[in-house]
């Protein structure tokens, strides 16, 4: 896993759309690194390495290391542009980080024991699949687990019900009680609806005979 979160990068000076197209034709990915009040740096990475790394969930939530001219730089992935129908990464945005400064990130949610919750006959509705968090880089979780084993019909788990790892806080909860958003709920199944065709097929009551 550590190897996948470390990528070799080269500084590029040939900029513009034409230069980016040439890079992609050479199986490379244009990128930019910014943040921490330093000048942005335009970079180039090998597509095969990026594509392999981005298949891992941790790529989107953990600290990455870019080796730039032999110097390691820690960062987070902030944006990734993909080709609309090809398996091609078009561009990457990296945010430079400092170990002493808190970062904002999105932690994916892993829902545990969902089958147990569904045994109640409930429809399990996911209201979010990731949670916006703030923490120091060393405290970044790869994911946040939510156990649904005790979730009963009609219940909802909110952000305030989630157990966050030490040093990690919810961005929404930090805004106040009005931002205690629903994360997942167990809803009663909708009653089966009789179709119009079924109603039409039902035998009509016989009208009383005229006297």
Swiss-Prot record:
Domain of life, per lineage: Bacteria
Low complexity bias (residue ranges): 201-211
InterPro entries reported in the protein's UniProt record: Rbsml_bL25/Gln-tRNA_synth_N, Ribosomal_bL25/Gln-tRNA_synth, Ribosomal_bL25_b-dom, Ribosomal_bL25_C, Ribosomal_bL25_long, Ribosomal_bL25_short, Ribosomal_L25_dom, Ribosomal_uL5_bac-type
Keyword Transport tagged: no
HAMAP family: Ribosomal_bL25, Ribosomal_bL25_CTC
GO CC term, one of those recorded: cytosolic large ribosomal subunit
Function, in words: This is one of the proteins that binds to the 5S RNA in the ribosome where it forms part of the central protuberance.
Protein name: Large ribosomal subunit protein bL25
Region of interest called Disordered, as start-end residue ranges on this chain: 188-211
């Amino acid at each position: 896993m550590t190897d996948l979160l470390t990528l070799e990068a080269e500084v590029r000076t040939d900029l513009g759309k034409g230069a980016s197209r040439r890079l992609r034709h050479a199986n490379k990915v244009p990128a930019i690194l910014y943040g921490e009040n330093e000048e942005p740096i335009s970079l180039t990475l090998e597509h095969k390495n990026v594509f392999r790394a981005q298949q891992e969930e941790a790529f989107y939530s953990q600290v990455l290391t870019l080796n730039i001219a032999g110097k390691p730089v820690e960062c987070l992935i902030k944006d990734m542009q993909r080709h609309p129908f090809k398996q091609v990464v078009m561009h990457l945005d990296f945010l430079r980080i400092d170990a002493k400064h808190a970062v904002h990130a999105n932690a994916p949610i892993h829902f545990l024991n969902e089958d147990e919750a569904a045994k109640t006959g409930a429809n399990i509705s996911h209201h979010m699949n990731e949670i916006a968090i703030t923490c120091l880089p060393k405290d970044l979780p790869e994911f946040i687990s939510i156990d649904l084993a005790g979730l009963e019909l009609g219940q909802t788990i909110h952000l305030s019900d989630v157990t966050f790892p030490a040093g990690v806080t919810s961005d929404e909860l930090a805004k106040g009680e009005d931002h205690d958003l629903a994360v997942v709920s167990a809803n009663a199944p909708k009653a089966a609806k009789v179709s119009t065709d079924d109603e039409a097929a039902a035998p009509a009551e016989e009208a009383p005979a005229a006297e």
